[in-house]
Curated annotation (Swiss-Prot):
Its EC number is 3.4.22.1. Expressed in myoblasts, the myotube, fibroblasts and fetal muscle (at protein level). Expressed in the spleen (at protein level). GO terms for molecular function: cysteine-type endopeptidase activity; endopeptidase activity. It comes from Bos taurus (Bovine). Disulfide bonds join C93-C122, C105-C150, C141-C207, C142-C146, C179-C211, C187-C198, C227-C331. It catalyses: Hydrolysis of proteins with broad specificity for peptide bonds. Preferentially cleaves -Arg-Arg-|-Xaa bonds in small molecule substrates (thus differing from cathepsin L). In addition to being an endopeptidase, shows peptidyl-dipeptidase activity, liberating C-terminal dipeptides. The lineage of its organism: Eukaryota, Metazoa, Chordata, Craniata, Vertebrata. GO terms for biological process: proteolysis involved in protein catabolic process. Belongs to the peptidase C1 family. It is found in: Lysosome; Melanosome; Secreted, Extracellular space; Apical cell membrane. Residues 18-79, 333-335 form a propeptide. It is a peripheral membrane protein. This is Cathepsin B.
Amino acid sequence: MWRLLATLSCLLVLTSARSSLYFPPLSDELVNFVNKQNTTWKAGHNFYNVDLSYVKKLCGAILGGPKLPQRDAFAADVVLPESFDAREQWPNCPTIKEIRDQGSCGSCWAFGAVEAISDRICIHSNGRVNVEVSAEDMLTCCGGECGDGCNGGFPSGAWNFWTKKGLVSGGLYNSHVGCRPYSIPPCEHHVNGSRPPCTGEGDTPKCSKTCEPGYSPSYKEDKHFGCSSYSVANNEKEIMAEIYKNGPVEGAFSVYSDFLLYKSGVYQHVSGEIMGGHAIRILGWGVENGTPYWLVGNSWNTDWGDNGFFKILRGQDHCGIESEIVAGMPCTHQY
């Protein structure tokens, strides 16, 4: 009996020690600790020579903000496959495969929205309309309803803005694609790269209601509108059904410092301090080595994670990933 109690006491001490261990964010020690746990994912370095203030600024989703009306449940009427990847389901929609870069700005709330909106315009126009919806237009012109620009915002406000005011086209930084391409440059995560260094500084650009020189139609004529915006219940099957029927959605979750080190596998939080809320685009699901996951596109460039994508534990609202799902439907009659 005493031997059993001693063993249990040791286990409790070890468990407590594991949860209370501190490793500096982005450190070799945290990478090694995660990998020694033999969990469902592998850690490695994605950021080099960056300020922690920059990394925290990337996490610009304000969690628990205003809620959109919840759409009616319909998952019971849908036969859902074990795995689903929107990139394969709609191969003629190139934006689904695209990974963007939010730069030194807490604009993830805008990126998750415009990425999923771009995908849905293509999907619901049966591939006739391929447009990169402008993150710049969303970030700079939405105003207080969306939060505070580069200092963080609400995914729900972003989708509501799309239905009320519409969004113009706009590609990546320096792409000269669309009416209002992104104006904040990608920054350098690596040691010997050519991009400017990543800092935590960065003001929200001004709202400009004109397209870049040489682009037509006009700003007003280039607007793409949503006909509805809504939240999806914190329910695994309802989220799956929404993606399966209508396309990628925007979600948000709590980021811990171990997530910054994600390289492959199915992420689940192991150790590290909280960094903030982060908005992303969920485009599918599956099962890897017995672990169910969501397939997610990030906005930290293709040199982060698994070519810019990651997988995260599905079905347990892990880090709140299932509690902030928002989406909407484009006005396809305008096409």
